[in-house]
Regions:
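RNA-contacting regions in translation and RNA-metabolism proteins
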Residues: 1-47, 59-82
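Glycine-centered tight-turn and secondary-structure capping sites
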Residues: 51-55
Length: 82
């Protein structure tokens, strides 16, 4: 499955940030032949922690996701869904 590495990495990082790790789910959607989107869902109280002040944590997660996607030769996007 395309994006498996991205999914594992994003899920791991997100679970380390939130208080309710059981509420975290990451779904990979294939947008094209070389593009994937990681849809991140977490409990509402934890979304603030996942996004961070001025989106700094979210930006870091996106950077890490792209680094993981590079291993598979993909482009990655991360969407935070509440």
């Amino acid at each position: 499955m395309k994006g498996a590495i991205v999914q594992r990495v994003v899920e791991y990082v997100t679970k380390e940030i939130v208080e309710d790790a059981d509420s975290v789910s990451v779904t990979i959607v294939e947008d094209g032949p070389d593009e994937v989107t990681a849809e991140v869902r977490a409990a509402k109280p934890d979304m603030g922690r996942v996004i961070g002040r001025r989106g700094r944590v979210a930006k870091s997660i996106r950077t890490i996701a792209q680094a993981a996607a590079d291993e598979e030769g993909l482009q990655a996007r991360v969407e935070f869904i509440d």
